[in-house]
Amino acid sequence: MPNEPFNLMSLQEAIDLLGVSRATIDRWRKDKRLPYLKIGKEVWIDRIQLELWVRGGMRNPVPAEKVAAGSAVFPLPSKEASSFQTEIETEITVGYQSGAALLWSALIVKSRGWFEQELRLAEPSRRYRVSWKHADSGMELVEELIAGRVQIASVGDYPIAASMELGRLLPRFQPAMLAFDGKCAGGTGISLVARKEEGIRYGDQLTSSSAISTVIRSSASRRLQAVLDRGRKEAVQVLGSRRMADCLAALLEGRVGAAMLWEPYLTWAQTLGAGMTVAADDCGGDYLTGIMADEAWARTHESVTVSYLKAHIRAHELIRRDPLAAASIIRDASGIPLEVILPVLASIRWDASVYSRDLLTLSRLGEDDSGLKLRSSSLSAGPAFQASYLQEAAAALKLPSLPDMAIPHDWTDDRLY
């Protein structure tokens, strides 16, 4: 069949023209109603319909009868238009935290330039400028996401749960979790540490005579509050800090009797002999971190989102394969000693994939704070989790495919992303 009179192109021609993967084209056909024509086993794309669909923001195309009447026909982008597009520079700001060990993958991505590398591979004709925004806590980055000053952010489980609630209060802010980062099981990764002279071994031994330090509005402060609530320790003085390094300094200098610390400061305190870990059942849940973006931004910058997740997965792979090389990068970026970094890296599960166990952890965390109930049956059940970006990133790296649903049951080590 001659294609030219009908303005048809093959599916592969459309893929080459748009510069996307086959998985993206298939998803657009399914979810965004990309216009196509199936003749026998072959899939064809009408050039005019495709152009109208792209110009319409990837929504429904103009009805076929209007196209046939010639009422709204636009030519495909010319060489001049493509040249103009390369002159437009798109700025992307990534928020990261050097003082949170479970989020150290971002330091590797930044140091190695892997995000920029993946962007060049995905869209060689586009110009991007990547900026990096350092923060001392995840809630700072959530505020930056809401303001539109940060597009991709690495945050802990409390900011993840809090952002879901903020999304309900602020209709224009629809947070999407793109992938997990570091994970720690069963209360590891974040704990209460008391000075040895305090003689405190259990949470119920806390008294009002000594203050406790932690980072305000954080995964650490939420867990500390749970310990205090369980033991009815309303009289205990809590000193809120903006930086976890300040909490460790207060503990070392004797200005507080205890501090709720996350890694690497937990291991650092133990290495320096600053105190003893306090046993507290309230800290027994998993400690999780992840990558977030605004859903509308991610949807309109799909190739950028997938590019970052590819770099993110590569950082995880480097940590697992060559922890010394990863630790050296982190030392240079954070100033934390190598002897602290290495054991911390080994204690963390570096896995971007989503398990039902993880969704249950976040659901419980949200219920504790605000009555938030995250749906855990399907990643596509609500705006909180978007599986397609991580799926495409894994496929591009030739890793085993990820399901649309959360991986059931417990963590396994046979597939790590």
Language model: regions and residue ranges:
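N-terminal hydrophobic or amphipathic helices and topogenic motifs
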Residues: 1-142, 146-147, 356-417
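Bilobed "Venus flytrap"/periplasmic-binding protein-like clamshell domains
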Residues: 91-118, 191-258, 263-268, 360-363
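Short helices/loops that flank or line small-molecule/ion binding pockets
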Residues: 136-153, 166, 241-260
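Acidic, polar ligand-binding/catalytic clefts
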Residues: 152-200, 249, 412, 416
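A ligand-binding cleft/hinge motif common to bilobed small-molecule-binding domains
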Residues: 154-170, 255-275, 360-371
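Pocket-lining segment of extracytoplasmic ligand-binding domains
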Residues: 159, 243-333
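Periplasmic-binding protein-like
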Residues: 174-194, 270-298, 309-312, 383-393, ...
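Secondary-structure end/capping motifs
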Residues: 302-381
